[in-house]
C-alpha cells in the first residue's frame, strides 16, 4: 500500500488508478449462544432459490429473499483532486477505538476516498456517501465485504436483502471478473474500479479487519472456531497531507461457530483466495503497518473517525475459523488465473518517472512468511512508442553509449529511430523530445545505447551529455536540410572548438521521396555539408525498407567506442618521455650477434605508463608479455645505415605512408601489441638487422618506427596492411597444412637415426639422446623406386615433426636451417637433391650437408649459434617479405599469434559477397519501387497489362513481358529494353524512368490514335506488333508541335533551359524525321547538351545523349559539356558524359570529325562507374539491350 501511495504524483492532469485487494471482515454482533448462531445460520441459507437472471433493483428493501449472492468486493471509488501541500509529512496511522461516526469535512488538496457503492444515487455533502448530517450512517449502505464472503456467520436481519445493481450476473458459476462501474457525480473527477463475483449477503455496518494473505496453503480442518478479537477502527485526517485508515479487528467475544458451509466445494469467494489460505498460528505476532507517507490522501473504510494523530496500525492475525475454505477445498483454476493476473499488475509495475513529489514509502507490508507487494505502480499517462524507463537513471554494469538525434520535424528522424528500435516502419512526426534505449554489440561487448531525440535546438545539457550526434534531414525537404546546418552551428557554439571526441553523422532520409515530392537536396550538397562538419560521415537511409538504418547506428556506436579508446590512449601517452630512457639499472642480458661477433651488453628500459594503459584498454593476457620491452636485442658492433631510403617501393609510396602520420596522431588506432624487434627486409640489398619499435594496431595495420619517440610523434614510420598478408615461422609448417604423404616421415629411419644427435653449446659437442622408436608400420621400406622421389618431401616433413615433438621446446638440429629467403631455398634444394640422388641414403645426404655447413661457418658451435634465432616472416600477396626477430621463443610465439588473430579479424571485417548482395538488393528494391510509383506505371504502356516488369529506357515507360519482345526487335535506337528484376539499376536510369513514366510517354507517343483501337492484355502478338511499330517506328500517333515557327533547335534550347522533360522528349521524337539543327544564337556557341550539363539535369543530359547529341561538341572557348558538369558539381552528369566518350575539357578547340564517335582520353581522369550502365550508353553501339 505504501508503494501505491508513494507513486501518486502531484499533477493536476494525471489520474492514478491503483487496484488494491483489501479484505475487510465484518464483525457480526455477538449471538446469544453458539447454539442459536448455529441454528440460525442454516435457516438463512437453506431454501433460497438461485435465479441469476432476476433483477434485484425491483425488490423491496424489507422483503426477505431465499437467495445467496456472490460478491468478491464492492465498488471502490477512487477520487483524486488537485495537489496538496507539498512537503508535509502525514501523521502516523494508529488504531482508534470504535466510536460513532461523524462527518468529516473534506480536507483541502488531493485525497483518496474508498467507500462502498451505495444502492442508489451517491450522497453528497461529506467525505463518505453514508455519512449524514446527523452523523449516523445510512441504513441502506452495506459493508464492502460481508462476512459470508469467506465463510463467516450470516448477519441477522439482512438474509434476503440485497443491494440493487451490485450482484453478479451469474452468481452460481463462481466466476471472478473485473468491471468498471459508472462513478457517482462528484465535484472532482475520479475513476471507479469494481470487482464482483463473491457471495455476499446483506449485513449491517460493522467493524472490519484488514487481512493480507501471503500465500496459498492447505485448507484448515472443519470445525475450527473463530478466535475472538478486539474490534478497533482507525482514522486520521489533516489538512494537506492527511491519511486515515479505518479498521476493525476480530469478531466479538463469544462468537459462535460457523454456519453451514456452501455445497460448492473448493471454491474461493475472494479475489485473493484468502478463504483457502491457512491462517497463521495463534501465537503469531500482530502485523504492524508503518506510517505511509501519502501526500494529501484520506482513506475511509467503514466509518469515519475524529481527526487526530495516527500511529502505525497493528493488525492481528486473523482467526483460523475465518481463514479456512469451504469444505477444505482448494481454489479453482479460474481463481488462480485471476489471482495471477491481478498479482502480475502489481509485480511488473515499477515506480514512475522522476518528478516532484514525496519519496515512496515502504515496499509493502511484511508478515512472518515474507513481504509482498500489495499495490500496483503508476500507470503511464502518455505511453511512448518504445518503452523508456529507469535505464536513464540507474547505474548499469555494461557501458553506455549516448546518442543524440537532431533534425527538423519533417526530417524523418522519428521514423528512423522507430525502424532501428522495432524493425518496422511507421510515419512519425514527433514534436516532443523522446528518450529510448537498446542494447547493441560493439567490438564484441554489449553496450546500452541511450538515444535522445531532441525536438528543438540543442542546449548546453544536451551538448555535454551526448557522445555522438546524428543530424537527420529529408532529401525532399529543403527546410530540413537548412535546419541541419543551423543545428550544427548551435551545437558547435555550445560545445566549443576545444572539446573533441564527438562522433558526428549526417543522414538523409528517402522516406518521403515520390513522384509528387521529388528529391531536392543533391548528393553533392549533402556531402559538402558533411565535409564542413569535420569528422562526419554521410548516409542515405530509407526507413520504409530499412536501407542503411542499422548501419548508421552501428557505425556511429563503433566510432564512439573508438574515440573513447583513443582518448584513453592519448592520456596514457602524455605521460611518456620524449625519448626512450636507457638506464644501467636494468638487468643486462648477454646477446649474441647473428654474424658471430662478440657478445655485447645492452640494456633498455621503457616507462611503464603505456604498458599499463594498454593492458587496461585491451585486457588481453596474451598481449601483456608483448607490451614489455625485450631484455636484450641483437646488435652488431658496427652498423651502417642503408643507402636506400625506401626499400619497399617508390618515393611516392614512402611519402604516402609517411603522410599518414596526420591520421595516426591523436586519432590513431589502439595498439594491441608493441615492443622492440629486430627487422630486416627480405627484398632489399641490405640484409642487416635493425632495431625497430613495432606496434600491432586494432585496425589491422602493423607499424614500425626507428624509435619510440618517432612512434609517439608519428614520424618516420611505415605500416603494412595485414589484410593481404600471412605470417610464417622458419622451419615450421602452418598448423593446418597436413602433408598428403601421411605418417611416412620415418621412411629409411630418418627420424630415428637423425634425432639421436643433439648438438650442444658446451665443451661436449654432441650428446646421444634417446628418441622414441617409431611404430613398425612406419619403418616399412617401399618396394619400388618411388621412395627416391618421396625422400625429399619426407625429410622436410621429418624436420617439421621433429621440431614440433621436441620436449624442451627448443628447435631440434633438423630444423636449424638458414633463413628461408627465396634464393636460399633454391640453393638448399639443389644441394639437398644432389647427394640424395647420387647416394640414395638420407643419412649420407644429411652428413654431407653438415660437412658443407662446417666448411662455411668454421665450427659446429657457430652453426648452432647462427641458426638459433627467434624470427618470423610476414609475406604479402605481392611477394614482399618482412623479417622480424624477437628476443625469445615466447615473445615470438606471442607476436605470431597476435598477428594471425588480427589477420583473421581483418578478413572477417571485409564485406562478404552475401552482405554486398543484400545491400545492393535493398538499394535496387528502393529504386524499383520508386519507378513503380511513377504516374501510370502500374500498367503496360502499350497494352494495359497490370504490373509490368520490363522497361524501355529511352521511352521512359514500363512494358509487359509480351510487349518487351517486340520492343527488342525495334532496335536500341528506338527502344532500349531492360528488366526490372534481372538487371542492375544505377541512379541515372532510375531518375529517367521516375521523371517520365507511362502517363507522360503516352501523352507524347500516343496523343492522337486516329480512331485506331489500342491492343489489350488479351491481344495477339500480331496486333501488339502492329500497334507498337505504328506508335514508335512510324510515329503515327505522335503529339504535334505547337504553332510556333521557331526551329527545333531553338525550341529544344528553350525546353532544356526550362527543364521541361516532356517537351524535350517530344522535340527529340520529332527530330527523328530529319537532322536536328541545334544552332542557337548563343554568344558562347553552347549546345543544349552544354546547357543541360551546366544545369546539372541528369535526365535531360541522358536523353540528349540517347537521341544522338554530339558528346564532343565544344563551345567558343573549346570546352566540352564535361567542363560544365564538373563546374556545376554534378558527378552523375560527368559520369554519363564519360560513359559516352566525352573528351576532357583541356583538349584543343578544333574538333575532329571522328570526335563524336571515338572516345578520347580525358585530361582530368575521373573514376569509372561500377554499374553496368557504361555498356549501354554509347551512341554507336549496335548491341540490343536484353
From Swiss-Prot:
<keyword id="KW-0479">Metal-binding</keyword>
<feature type="modified residue" description="Phosphoserine">
    <location>
        <position position="921"/>
    </location>
</feature>
<dbReference type="Pfam" id="PF12796">
    <property type="entry name" value="Ank_2"/>
</dbReference>
<dbReference type="GO" id="GO:0009897">
    <property type="term" value="C:external side of plasma membrane"/>
</dbReference>
<dbReference type="GO" id="GO:0003924">
    <property type="term" value="F:GTPase activity"/>
</dbReference>
<keyword id="KW-0597">Phosphoprotein</keyword>
<feature type="modified residue" description="Phosphoserine">
    <location>
        <position position="632"/>
    </location>
</feature>
<dbReference type="GO" id="GO:0016197">
    <property type="term" value="P:endosomal transport"/>
</dbReference>
<dbReference type="GO" id="GO:1904036">
    <property type="term" value="P:negative regulation of epithelial cell apoptotic process"/>
</dbReference>
<feature type="region of interest" description="Interaction with PLCG1">
    <location>
        <begin position="262"/>
        <end position="384"/>
    </location>
</feature>
<feature type="region of interest" description="Interactions with HOMER1 and NF2">
    <location>
        <begin position="180"/>
        <end position="225"/>
    </location>
</feature>
<feature type="compositionally biased region" description="Basic and acidic residues">
    <location>
        <begin position="47"/>
        <end position="62"/>
    </location>
</feature>
<keyword id="KW-0677">Repeat</keyword>
<dbReference type="InterPro" id="IPR037278">
    <property type="entry name" value="ARFGAP/RecO"/>
</dbReference>
<dbReference type="InterPro" id="IPR001164">
    <property type="entry name" value="ArfGAP_dom"/>
</dbReference>
<dbReference type="GO" id="GO:0005525">
    <property type="term" value="F:GTP binding"/>
</dbReference>
<keyword id="KW-0342">GTP-binding</keyword>
<dbReference type="InterPro" id="IPR001806">
    <property type="entry name" value="Small_GTPase"/>
</dbReference>
<keyword id="KW-0343">GTPase activation</keyword>
<keyword id="KW-0862">Zinc</keyword>
<dbReference type="InterPro" id="IPR001849">
    <property type="entry name" value="PH_domain"/>
</dbReference>
<feature type="compositionally biased region" description="Basic and acidic residues">
    <location>
        <begin position="648"/>
        <end position="661"/>
    </location>
</feature>
<dbReference type="GO" id="GO:0035255">
    <property type="term" value="F:ionotropic glutamate receptor binding"/>
</dbReference>
<feature type="domain" description="GLD">
    <location>
        <begin position="396"/>
        <end position="572"/>
    </location>
</feature>
<feature type="repeat" description="ANK 1">
    <location>
        <begin position="1084"/>
        <end position="1113"/>
    </location>
</feature>
<dbReference type="GO" id="GO:0019901">
    <property type="term" value="F:protein kinase binding"/>
</dbReference>
<feature type="region of interest" description="Disordered">
    <location>
        <begin position="1145"/>
        <end position="1174"/>
    </location>
</feature>
<feature type="compositionally biased region" description="Low complexity">
    <location>
        <begin position="1148"/>
        <end position="1166"/>
    </location>
</feature>
<feature type="modified residue" description="Phosphoserine">
    <location>
        <position position="128"/>
    </location>
</feature>
<dbReference type="InterPro" id="IPR027417">
    <property type="entry name" value="P-loop_NTPase"/>
</dbReference>
<dbReference type="InterPro" id="IPR036770">
    <property type="entry name" value="Ankyrin_rpt-contain_sf"/>
</dbReference>
<dbReference type="GO" id="GO:0005524">
    <property type="term" value="F:ATP binding"/>
</dbReference>
<dbReference type="GO" id="GO:0005096">
    <property type="term" value="F:GTPase activator activity"/>
</dbReference>
<dbReference type="GO" id="GO:0005737">
    <property type="term" value="C:cytoplasm"/>
</dbReference>
<feature type="region of interest" description="Disordered">
    <location>
        <begin position="800"/>
        <end position="844"/>
    </location>
</feature>
<dbReference type="GO" id="GO:0005634">
    <property type="term" value="C:nucleus"/>
</dbReference>
<dbReference type="Pfam" id="PF00071">
    <property type="entry name" value="Ras"/>
</dbReference>
<dbReference type="InterPro" id="IPR051282">
    <property type="entry name" value="Arf-GAP_GTPase_ANK_PH"/>
</dbReference>
<dbReference type="GO" id="GO:0030295">
    <property type="term" value="F:protein kinase activator activity"/>
</dbReference>
<keyword id="KW-0863">Zinc-finger</keyword>
<feature type="modified residue" description="Phosphoserine">
    <location>
        <position position="744"/>
    </location>
</feature>
<dbReference type="GO" id="GO:0005654">
    <property type="term" value="C:nucleoplasm"/>
</dbReference>
